Amino acid sequence: MESQYNAAEIEQKWQQDWVNQGLDKTPENSDKPKFYALSMFPYPSGNLHMGHVRNYVITDVIARLKRLQGYRVLHPMGWDAFGLPAENAAIDRNIPPADWTYKNIAQMKQQLQTLGLSIDWDREVATCSPDYYKWTQWLFLQFYQAGLAYQKEAAVNWDPIDQTVLANEQVDSEGYSWRSGAKVERKLLRQWFFKITDYAEQLLTDLDKLTGWPDRVKLMQENWIGKSVGAYLEFPVKGSEEKIAVFTTRPDTVYGVTYVVLAPEHPLTPKVTTEGQKEAVEAFIEEVSNESEIERTAEDKPKRGILTGGTAVNPFNGEEIPILIADYVLYEYGTGAVMGVPAHDTRDFKFATEKELPIKVVIVPENSEDNNPTLTEAYTEPGIMVNSGEFNGMQSTEGKTAIINYAEKQGYGKARIQYRLRDWLISRQRYWGCPIPVVHCPSCGTVAVPDADLPVKLPENVEFTGRGASPLAKMEDWINVPCPSCGEPAKRETDTMDTFIDSSWYYLRYTDAMNDQEAFKLEKANDWMNVDQYVGGIEHAILHLLYSRFFTKVLRDRGLVNVDEPFKRLLTQGMVQAMAYKNPKTGKYIPVDKVNPESPKDPDTGDDLEVFYEKMSKSKYNGVDPQKVLGKYGADTARMFILFKAPPEKDLEWDDADVEGQFRFLNRVWRLVNGYEKKQGEVISNKELSKEEKDLRRAIHTAIKEISEDLEGDYQFNTAVSELMKLSNALNDAKCINSEVYQEGIETLLILLAPFAPHIAEELWHNLGHETSIHLETWPQVDPDALVVDEITLVIQIMGKTRGTIQVPANSSKEELEKLARESDIGQRNLDGKEVKKVIVVPGKLVNFVVPK
């Protein structure tokens, strides 16, 4: 056996051996209980970063643990491989997106393998492979057949110089194109949507089923879905047959409406605008149309609006109220119109004050003597209805129902539930995405591509310029095809799908990844689903996780799966942070290697630098290359540091000294095990053990108990590693090295260590003479008898002051404890010749003698 711990040598050796043994392959046809452990798959950027390492190491520890605990484990990996960066690479480097992507996949896969991850690579998927996106297209057609995929016009970001559509991430915070520098415009295009709103209520109520998800994530989804209970009310337009429909959660304030506001894009806007206001309104619409939704609705931005000249009528009191348009009202939300109640809505109060619009109080606090107070801010609390006709004096909470009932009887309103969630826009005017499998025929309209003709493959030899229409729209040979229905000339859809679609079902493909006849067999999906433990970043709390839940429910309704939810438990790991240095005067970050950490100054200006932990990134110059860490210390040390430094859900602060500390710990384990001479003997029996052996065995089984508990539920890896260190120290300090208990301790230490540091555990296991892999062993079980304490430490006090301690039998009665304390050397020395007035005995802890002063 090696005298020195050579991480690189043993890690390379065992990684190859595990491949040769097929140790990580997913067991089929096993009667063991199943466990599906899954990390969110990465975009193949080409380089692994520490955030990746943390994610995949966490999942790997869980997968390895569950195998040791007797589960058959599915632990796959793949690549979320479509997306904009590949097209940018094609433009900037003149490389086909596929070449760039597959090169990056190969590079990242090799980096992942050096971490010693127990991944079943036979199930590897890449979403850009026709073998995968054939089934993405097939699933799109399932949605289409179910009436859940449709087309309508929607706004996109348009670069007027490059004459191309831009993704949101290609537009800077000021609204300019990142490539051409042009001011980005908003343009309407006909695009594809998925009807996720049909599932809004299910997506909301089923959050209650997700008991293994962080409350924070569930709350984020709940807010995103945004259920509101209220009323749909109609305000007639004066001098017209038109009516303005609004949704409100405060129908009790309807008598306080002093204006209504339309979205600039609302179809009624031109109809209600008077001739005198036409020019101003059109100019306002032009100005607003080029702003993003985020810009228009930002809370810290002043709300802008303009009078249309039109007038509406409040049907409840007959009052005439002005009609405005404003930037903060979006046509896609609700009805595209809102009623203004400035007395009882904070935003409306500010807007009305700036526009000098009337403010009418209709709710006052209970016991208020003034029904028409002058307000300095909106009153938004419940209260008593006033200035509200027949509803005066009613509690506002009761008034909501009363107003709705009245509106329904009168025919100008009804109860309604509304959701903030909008249908999912899935169209992308991009090349490097999954083609939408439909054909547009002049005679037949939109026609689905038959299943037999899938996949619709992306054409090759495409020119990427970054200008003009999507590259697909220029591929005439690819676009022009016969209609699948009538055979006449037709054109393919040139939009590709949002990459979130690819990641909304990949967890199902893993259950049957090599199937070339189906997306997945129902039996296999039902066998493995749900994912038992999903691990990924909090940044995916809403879109990816919500879309995956939506997909699962649709596929359930299509008879393709038997589960309601895709992910049983969710762990959102924290970020990996490192020290960053920033010049507060210039705002520039300074590379870590150019700063003296003991006296951090800007090397160019001499200015003192701000020093703080921040998420690792290229722009902050504080990234740590995983390959350098692995090269210096090995994968096991990197894994141990990642797991020990912080609880998995918390942010982790990188510290080279702590990495070094984990390396030293593994070296201690190496020396400890290799210094042990293995002895054969009889089965352990507590009755035959010496006190020292019992103490050591108690330490062994305490470690088993504590680590097993740490790895259940919340996965507190950091405290589990601490317990490994305690056990290592106990073994290092033990004198009974030739005993069977010591042998049990050494082997237990290695099995407990195996999920965390799999390579060194395997090497040392074989050094002990074992011929089969440690990863095929069984997780050790706690022996309750070993935890029983024969003796305890008893504190002896005189007048409340500690005079010393003695060892006593653990099961001693109060009387026995007093007797043992009196008869001890400490007792005799301190009580000699003194009268004991009182004795206080705290069983298992102390005896306190009260004596006269």
Swiss-Prot record:
It is an enzyme of class 6 (ligase). Its main location: cytoplasm. Gene3D superfamilies: HUPs, Isoleucyl-tRNA Synthetase, Domain 1. ATP binds at K618. It holds the Pfam family tRNA-synt_1_2. GO terms for molecular function: aminoacyl-tRNA deacylase activity; ATP binding; leucine-tRNA ligase activity. Its EC number is 6.1.1.4. InterPro entries: aa-tRNA-synth_I_CS (IPR001412), aa-tRNA-synth_Ia (IPR002300), Leu-tRNA-ligase (IPR002302), Leu_tRNA-synth_edit (IPR025709), M/V/L/I-tRNA-synth_anticd-bd (IPR013155), Methionyl/Leucyl_tRNA_Synth (IPR015413), Rossmann-like_a/b/a_fold (IPR014729), tRNAsynth_Ia_anticodon-bd (IPR009080). GO terms for cellular component: cytosol. NCBIfam families: leuS_bact. This is Leucine--tRNA ligase. It comes from Crocosphaera subtropica (strain ATCC 51142 / BH68). The lineage of its organism: Bacteria, Bacillati, Cyanobacteriota, Cyanophyceae, Oscillatoriophycideae.
